[in-house]
């Protein structure tokens, strides 16, 4: 196994099965963040993740962290909070603000550089990247964004500036996603936070099989239309 240097003149990727075991899932470096290359990556189960100043690194870890939306774990306290939630939740109202929020709300730095923000904003304008916003009155207090692949959603990042804001984003999105035929959420790499929400690890081979099936599926044509998903009770 060896690390592959990508060409700027081709958007082809090597097979994810050739990714390194250590660091787990590192597959290639270089290339660019053009919409065509990003979409090719997601279609093959590959995503970019790198530190500012480093070359673009491309990953496909084994195992892969996923969340079956129906298995989302909601604690009793979160259920009580949501019943009296002060938040309004929207979809695709403020993609730019959400990704900026994800980039700025990291105390120890972030991989979401200016170039990454611009790249995913282009994907959003093309209808492939989407955001969920959580509002307290007119203030954006949390949210999440990711890339759609048919009935699979590749979650990228989330942020929270008030109590339970990011959990509210995920809860409301999962309910809406399941209700319209969504099947699976890609969480990339398991961490304590995603594990507490019900995410689990599956073999990369299984994830790629799910991806190949689900990316050909379709949600309703109007699913990603900007709209309000949840409003607080009066």
Curated annotation (Swiss-Prot):
GO terms for biological process: protein catabolic process. Pfam families: Leu_Phe_trans. It is an enzyme of class 2 (transferase). The keyword Acyltransferase applies. InterPro entries: Acyl_CoA_acyltransferase (IPR016181), Leu/Phe-tRNA_Trfase (IPR004616), Leu/Phe-tRNA_Trfase_C (IPR042203), Leu/Phe-tRNA_Trfase_N (IPR042221). It catalyses: N-terminal L-lysyl-[protein] + L-leucyl-tRNA(Leu) = N-terminal L-leucyl-L-lysyl-[protein] + tRNA(Leu) + H(+); N-terminal L-arginyl-[protein] + L-leucyl-tRNA(Leu) = N-terminal L-leucyl-L-arginyl-[protein] + tRNA(Leu) + H(+); L-phenylalanyl-tRNA(Phe) + an N-terminal L-alpha-aminoacyl-[protein] = an N-terminal L-phenylalanyl-L-alpha-aminoacyl-[protein] + tRNA(Phe). It is found in: Cytoplasm. Functions in the N-end rule pathway of protein degradation where it conjugates Leu, Phe and, less efficiently, Met from aminoacyl-tRNAs to the N-termini of proteins containing an N-terminal arginine or lysine. Monomer. Belongs to the L/F-transferase family. This is Leucyl/phenylalanyl-tRNA--protein transferase. It comes from Escherichia coli (strain K12). The gene is aat.
């Amino acid at each position: 196994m060896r690390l592959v240097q990508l060409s700027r003149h081709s958007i082809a990727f090597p097979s994810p099965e050739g990714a390194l075991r250590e660091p787990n899932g590192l597959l290639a470096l270089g290339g660019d963040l053009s919409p065509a290359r990003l979409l090719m990556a997601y279609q093959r189960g590959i995503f970019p993740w790198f530190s500012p100043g480093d070359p673009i690194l491309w990953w496909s870890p084994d195992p892969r962290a996923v969340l079956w939306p129906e298995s989302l774990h909601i604690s009793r306290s979160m259920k009580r909070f949501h019943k009296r939630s002060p938040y309004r939740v929207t979809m695709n109202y403020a993609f730019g603000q959400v990704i900026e929020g994800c980039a700025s709300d990291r105390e120890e730095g972030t991989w979401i550089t200016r170039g990454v923000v611009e790249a995913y904003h282009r994907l959003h304008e093309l209808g492939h990247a989407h955001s969920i916003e959580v509002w307290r009155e007119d203030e954006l207090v949390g949210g999440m964004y990711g890339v759609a692949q048919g009935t699979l959603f590749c979650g990228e990042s989330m942020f929270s500036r008030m109590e339970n804001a990011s959990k509210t984003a995920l809860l409301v999105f999962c309910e809406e996603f399941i209700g319209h035929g969504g099947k699976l959420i890609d969480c990339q790499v398991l961490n304590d936070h995603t594990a507490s929400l019900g995410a689990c690890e599956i073999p990369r081979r299984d994830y790629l099989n799910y991806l190949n099936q689900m990316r050909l599926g379709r949600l309703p044509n109007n699913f990603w239309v900007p709209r309000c998903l949840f409003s607080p009770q009066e």
